[in-house]
Amino acid sequence: MPWIQLIIDTKAKYAEQVGDMLSANGAQAVTFVDAKDTPMYEPKPGEVMLWPETQVMGLYEADYDMDGVVARMSKSKVLGADFPHKLDQLEDKDWEREWMDNFHPMRFGQRLWICPSWRDVPDPSAVNVMLDPGLAFGTGTHPTTALCLRWLDALELSDKLVVDFGCGSGILGIAAIKLGAKRVVGIDIDPQALLSSQTNADRNHIGDKIELYLPEHQPELKADVVLANILAGPLRDLREVITAYCKSGGKLVLSGILAEQAQGINDLYSQDFHMEPIEIDGEWARVSGKRK
C-alpha cells in the first residue's frame, strides 16, 4: 500500500507540538529530522534532542483525507493559516528489506570487520564481529565508534584487561576480545545497554569473557586499556574515575567528542597521560594517550 508524507518545517520549540498535532490528525508515524544539517550538541539531562530548524514528517495512508488534515492544522496558533508544508507520495516498498540492503560489512583498520548477521563475512580469516545495525547503541556507522575501532585494531591486545565506559551495544569490548583481549569489563548507566552488550557478546560466542555493571556496582581494578566513547561532559566529570582504572603504562582512548571539544579534553587528561595526536573524522574527534 502506498503512503503520503506530510512534511512541515518548524522551530525546535514547536516541533513536539507539531508532532502531537500530526498524531492527533491520524498520522501512522511521526519523524523528526534536521532541516539544515546542523551539528547536534549535548542535551541537558531529560532534554529532547531537536535541531534549531526541525523538519517534522507525518506518515499517512494514501487514501487519507490530507486536505482535511491541512485545514485542521492551519487553525492552530503554532502553524497559522498558510503554514509552509509539502506532501510527498511514497511508493509501496518492502521497507525492512530496503533498510537491510543499505547495510554492508565494514572494515576498520587492517584486521577488523563489523558484519550484519544477514551478510556473508567478506574474509573468514579476518577478525569478524557480528553485529546488526540498530538505533539505540553503537554499530560502527558513527564516526566516534569508527575512530575507536580503528584505534583498537592497531593495538596489541593479547591477554589484556579492558574497561569499556558507556559500553552501549558492547561493540568496542567485543572487538577488543576478538582482537585478543582476555577479559572486558563494561560499564553503562542504562540497564538496556548492558542487556544489549551481553546479547551481542553471546552472539559472538565470547559471552563468558565480558562482565557488565551499572556504575553503582562497578568493580575496582587496574586495566591495560580503558575505552570511553561517551560525551565531552561525562568525560570531564568522570576524569578521576576513568583515570583510576588505567594502570601505569596503560592505554586510554576517548571519543564521543566534537572536534572543537577535543583540545580541552586532551589538555584535561594530559595531567595523568602522555597524550597522542588528536584524530579528527569530520565533526568528531578521538583523544588517546598512555598513562604516566
Curated annotation (Swiss-Prot):
The enzyme's E.C. designation: 2.1.1.-
Family matches, as SUPFAM superfamilies: S-adenosyl-L-methionine-dependent methyltransferases (SSF53335)
One GO cellular component, as annotated: cytosol
Tree of life domain: Bacteria
GO molecular function terms noted in the UniProt entry: protein-lysine N-methyltransferase activity
Reaction(s) the record says it catalyses: L-lysyl-[protein] + 3 S-adenosyl-L-methionine = N(6),N(6),N(6)-trimethyl-L-lysyl-[protein] + 3 S-adenosyl-L-homocysteine + 3 H(+)
Keyword Methyltransferase among record annotations: yes
UniProtKB keywords: Cytoplasm, Methyltransferase, S-adenosyl-L-methionine, Transferase
Function text: Methylates ribosomal protein L11.
Protein name stated in the entry: Ribosomal protein L11 methyltransferase
